[in-house]
């Protein structure tokens, strides 16, 4: 009974295209996210017994409350998941369900793609389980619609079993996490909790309270275009300047060469002509000192190039995006200790590792609500090879219920 609607709920959610748009200036960045909140999630939240369900058009958050039914459980706990999906085709998502996976390749629909344990050895962790995959033409959207489905399913179970005692619960579904702005307008006053959890992690047991600190870097290169036949000592090729800048960054400090606590510079876009070019980077690191050092390094490279050129032709724009939430959460580890205790009671081994990325919790933690991250089940996220285990989603439901009953 507890999980009866979990799979159908998840399938219903992922079939709705809620891809965010990094070039949009609205909140949410796409109309589909607001429509998803208002036409699908809000009525369902009300139907399963959440109270004071309301949508804030300013920040795109849909929030509901389940009051405590035991006054001795005095903590207030929040659960957060994001509605948007990543920068990959999300139109006409057509999930396929693999019952009792027995190993080997999984052909993704009628496409030429397959999930191969040689390429994706994480498949070997799911023998005997029910897997939900893509058809090879879209992403799945388990990031983070598995989290939404898990929260909804846990709330539905609690309201259907009033004899199960629980604390005050707040639920929030927000926009635009994948483009890094989802929590920018989050209203703490509308989410009065002692701490919260984002249900936005990956495999079973993930419990995370360390994220990258993140910055966006835009570098503009100003060239001077003249006819190539008479270009000697006159032309300044902006594209060559961009290449020169990139080559001055440490070659091994890129995503494909780093893991664990190692930071990186990641070139995400390069456009231009001889006259003008533009390079987009993201900068990531865990430690505050090394994060700041990376930003200083790019500034110094630009200054050095400009000095050599004799004029300012390399223009740097740096914007911090979010910070490592460890700095906030380690001051009070209650949320982590509670989650560890609940997982261990459920025979789930907590896997406490840094997130090589960020969550909405990164920003919300710095707003005053410690918000670590818990597994939601997704694997190979952000692309056609994404999949999720139904059994892992069920365990996430168990963790949510355990947290609010133990508070």
From Swiss-Prot:
Protein name: Peptidase T
Family, per entry: Belongs to the peptidase M20B family.
Positions of Zn(2+) 1 binding: 82, 143, 200
Localization: Cytoplasm
Cofactor(s) for this UniProt protein: Zn(2+)
Alphabetic keyword roster: Aminopeptidase, Cytoplasm, Hydrolase, Metal-binding, Metalloprotease, Protease, Zinc
InterPro entries per the UniProt record, alphabetical: ArgE/DapE_CS, Bact_exopeptidase_dim_dom, Peptidase_M20, Peptidase_M20_dimer, Peptidase_M20B
Residues bound to Zn(2+) 2: 143, 178, 382
The reaction(s) this protein catalyses: Release of the N-terminal residue from a tripeptide
Active site location: 84, 177
Note on how the cofactor is bound: Binds 2 Zn(2+) ions per subunit.
Record-level GO cellular component terms: cytosol
GO molecular function: metallopeptidase activity; tripeptide aminopeptidase activity; zinc ion binding
